[in-house]
């Protein structure tokens, strides 16, 4: 009776019984129990997915999708960076940080500076600072419309013409 049951296990795996082979039962069990036709399907059918995840030590992050929405995990493409000057950093939240030089003319006049990339919605704030060359005795200031909503540019004016300046802008 036991031999018949063992033979039926081998036959259920699709193998034919051979008297000279001594690994038929093991081969049949592997074929039947370790099938890759529906990996982990038995766990789902048993309703033990949560227990399997606990046994594997997988936390909540393993169940999240990749993206920038709520309850998603951002991939590195969500942190775009152009580290040049001018440059920018995009964050998964949609916030964009931009920086670069301001070309201050030799006469006191308004200067239009374009951002490295357009903000998709609007500029939230621009910070401008005039540079200083040690030993030059030239200390200046620069001002701009800090709460600028233009997504592509801002306007500034330097107190001392010809001295370099730079900006830092936040937008979304």
Swiss-Prot record:
InterPro entries per UniProt: Gp53-like_C
Pfam families named in the record: Gp53-like_C (PF21882)
Additional information: Encoded by the CPS-53 (KpLE1) prophage.
Assigned protein family: To E.coli StfP and M.jannaschii MJ0347.
Protein name: Putative uncharacterized protein YfdL
